[in-house]
Amino acid sequence: MGRKVLVGLLVLVALGTIAISQRHKILIPLITTGAQIPQLVDASPVPGGQPFGDENHFSIVQLDEKTFAIAEPYSWARNVNYLILGDRRALLFDAGVGHYDIRPVVESLTDLPVTFMPSHFHYDHTGQGNWTKIAIVDLPHIRERADGNLLQPTWGEHLGDGEGIELPTWDVT
């Protein structure tokens, strides 16, 4: 009897450990449909924001002479992305979910070549990552995973599967 209880407890501990370590792979498919999350009906107003585009998905706020906040007030994530203008290049820090292309917004604000840099690899910050120049923080554990200049975020880093967004492979410069 005691041995059965011990084996049962060990099995429960093993299952609990697996469930905790794989929780996102278990929960996301259970709570999502794999379809795009609809836009919000009511936007969060962006103080001083100028709507952009036919659907006003983006709202632009100029923070200073060379810095723009590009908000997505109708996105469930309500992201704020930043465009920072330099003398020779511009840096786009985050690019939203990517259901609406942020590129026309960026092109309306600068003629400079743009380097995209995500704050992290979740899909709601990478804009689906199809940029000519992509910069990633150069950390040893990320460099080890790269195949030359090609880098693919892991499923757990990206989490786009819940909205049917496939893992990207980025050509990092």
Regions found by a protein language model. Name each.
Residues M1-K4:
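Positively charged n-region of N-terminal signal peptides that target proteins for export
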Residues L6-A19:
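Hydrophobic membrane-insertion alpha-helices, especially the h-region
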Residues S21-L27, H99-T173:
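Active-site HxH/HxHxD metal-binding segment of metal-dependent hydrolases
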Residues H24-P38:
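Ser/Thr/Pro/Gly-rich low-complexity linker/stalk segments immediately outside membranes or between
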Residues Q39-P45:
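Extreme N-terminal tail/first-helix region
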Residues V41, Q62-F68, I165-V172:
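Short Pro/Gly-enriched beta-strand edge/turn motifs at strand-loop
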Residues G49-P51:
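N-terminal helix-forming leader/targeting segments
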Residues D54-S108:
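Conserved beta-strand hairpin/beta-sheet module of binuclear metal-dependent hydrolase folds
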